[in-house]
Amino acid sequence: MDLGTTKYIIYTELIADGYVEKHDVIGAIFGQTEGLLSNELDLRDLQKSGRIGRIDVDLENINGKSFAKITLPSSLDKVETSILAATLETIDRVGPCFATVKITEVEDIRVSKRQYITNRARSILRKLMDEMIDTYEITEEIKESLRTEEIMEFGPENLPCGPNVVHSDSIIVVEGRADVLNLLRCGIKNTVAVEGTSVPKSIMDLTKKKTTTAFTDGDRGGELILKELLQTCDIDYVARAPYGKEVEGTSKKEIMKCLRAKVPVEQIVGNTCNDTCNVSKVIENRPEEIVEPITHKYYEKVETPVTEPVFEDEIVEEETVIVEPVKKTETEIIDVDATNEIQADKKFSGVKEIVDSIKNTGNVKFVVDGTEKTNTFKEFLTNIHEIKKMDFFAADMPISQKIVDLLYDKTPIIVGKEIHVTKKPVNLRLFSFDEIVA
């Protein structure tokens, strides 16, 4: 059915008591409605002028009766269409047979069109949004291409580096090209990569002339490269990516945090007693979110000006800071009468045995409801939210202020390899291993 300019469709059902044919039904519609209404609503005139469409009749003859479904398109307004529909119900004979006619529905075809328009518009919009390139993506794509163009080459080995490496007073040494690119994304342009575990001679010479920060991955590979750098280059500061992460996969916020937390190389060497820099053990015992940055046991925390990374075209002048060793002093934080108190107080019974059991293991041991439990420090931090109260806590590691702040309301006693805190809650007892075994 060609709807054309149709506004409404009248659906009608007709039942005749005898056998009739389609032309009988059409004749009855035109014949019995003729003259009922004014000439403006005469079906023949309306059809000639195109204001109503072709009348469709779907006829069936069953058991001596005839059943017809009649469809009449109308482009009249709703009032005239309603009058026309009511007129059809006045038909009472078709041919020689009695008949009844009933209007089943008058459909506003424009509603269907509006629904189609709505659904189709949704589909088109969804397709457009899927195909549309976001402005942010365009911006990032352009920035990425510019950053890639900014990567330069340094030395006869053609090492990837940032554009400010030659002119800056300070440099950051990383592992590979991807690390240089990630730091460029963060606006850090004084970076150069060693491209492997064998440090090129041009890097060795460059580190002698500039203040150098070694920034390596937080895994075993990063530790090996750091060892190589410390043995072959003149490194001033050391920074590590978060534990288990690579520099190339670290976010801008984490990179800035790591670079600001860099430590002088003297502290790294001191921590390992001038050994081949066993940094992994230090890092494993120092989760970033809890423990203070690495400090040598013969050094107090010293505020030192550190070099910020160079951003964009900015070149920062730096001074080499020498960390002087200072003598460890007794403070009121540590209980002076620790040995006598431990021997006198029953709640400290068994402490020496617990301390002996975790010495040189890097583990922690704590007592909950009379039950002793042993974990690595990392496992302990993971499950700490499940622990409400502890009778006792001991760790084969230095006790920092952050550990005290974390545990002061969970246990009355904390024992560690060393005590490095500035504030102690009144109801908390802090003991070092040396005091326990004295």
From Swiss-Prot:
Amino acids binding Mg(2+) 1: 175, 217
Biological process (GO), any one: DNA replication, synthesis of primer
Cofactor stoichiometry and binding remark: Binds two Mg(2+) per subunit.
Pfam families registered for this protein in UniProt: Toprim_4
Enzyme class: transferase
GO molecular function terms attached to this record: DNA-directed RNA polymerase activity; metal ion binding; poly(A) binding
This protein's record includes keyword Transferase: yes
Positions of the Toprim domain: 169-243
Cofactors, names only: Mg(2+)
Binding-site residues for Mg(2+) 2, renumbered to this chain: 217, 219
Domain of life: Archaea
EC number(s) given by UniProt: 2.7.7.101
GO cellular component, one term: primosome complex
Methyltransferase found in the keyword field: no
Keyword set, alphabetical order: DNA replication, DNA-directed RNA polymerase, Magnesium, Metal-binding, Nucleotidyltransferase, Primosome, Transcription, Transferase
UniProt catalytic activity: ssDNA + n NTP = ssDNA/pppN(pN)n-1 hybrid + (n-1) diphosphate
Assigned protein family: Belongs to the archaeal DnaG primase family.
Function: RNA polymerase that catalyzes the synthesis of short RNA molecules used as primers for DNA polymerase during DNA replication.
Subunit comment: Forms a ternary complex with MCM helicase and DNA.
Protein name: DNA primase DnaG
Organism of origin: Methanococcus maripaludis (strain C6 / ATCC BAA-1332)
Gene this chain is encoded by: dnaG
